Amino acid sequence: MGIDIRHNKDRKVRRKEPKSQDIYLRLLVKLYRFLARRTNSSFNRVVLKRLFMSRTNRPPLSMSRLIRKMKLPRRENKTAVVVGCITADVRIHDIPKLTVCALKLTSGARSRILKAGGQIMTFDQLALAAPKGQNTVLLSGPRKAREVYRHFGKAPSTPHSRTKPYVLSKGRKFERARGRRASRGYKN
């Protein structure tokens, strides 16, 4: 008598639609689903996939990083595309003229880009201007910049681990012996 194959782990877990009920996001999904199907452009497929992502997987992009990435060679006069939010950076004084397309911009970022003579587009405007993603640079924020990633990895109390422990308090008596001082076993 044969053994039934266990089918409970067969499912490929990936999003086929956004979790959000935001009607404007869902309209963009409709548009980019059409473009991904009808054009042979990988740009539209990537944008569609990113529209499905959770907020933690769509980290914000600061203006300083945006400017740095757009200053790279052969990127002048191209549109920066961010499937997420662009945030202002007060440390940056002079902002070049940029053409930007993003899901959201903070009010500070929006005013500074426009003041520098730049242009801000929405994704439906981008679909008309560049239906195949021509002359665009697809950017995203640093996904691993969240504080929670410091706690991931090799266990905190093991040799050569740089993982941040979850501690109740940062006092003298908390997690200060083994692994923190050479006289107590080892020091990382």
UniProtKB/Swiss-Prot annotation:
Gene3D superfamilies in UniProt: 3.100.10.10
Record's compositionally biased regions (Basic residues): 178-188
Gene Ontology cellular component annotations, sorted alphabetically: cytosolic large ribosomal subunit
GO terms, molecular function: RNA binding; structural constituent of ribosome
GO biological process, one term: cytoplasmic translation
Transmembrane segments: none
Signal peptide range: none
UniProt keywords, alphabetically: Cytoplasm, Ribonucleoprotein, Ribosomal protein
Region described as Disordered: 153-188
Pfam families: Ribosomal_L18
InterPro entries membership: Ribosomal_eL18, Ribosomal_eL18/eL18-A/B/_CS, Ribosomal_uL15/eL18, Ribosomal_uL15/eL18_sf
Presence of keyword Ribosomal protein: yes
Subcellular location(s) per record: Cytoplasm
Domain of life: Eukaryota
Keyword Cytoplasm: yes
Quaternary data: Component of the large ribosomal subunit.
Family: Belongs to the eukaryotic ribosomal protein eL18 family.
Stated role: Component of the large ribosomal subunit. The ribosome is a large ribonucleoprotein complex responsible for the synthesis of proteins in the cell.
Protein name in UniProt: Large ribosomal subunit protein eL18A
UniProt source species: Xenopus laevis (African clawed frog)
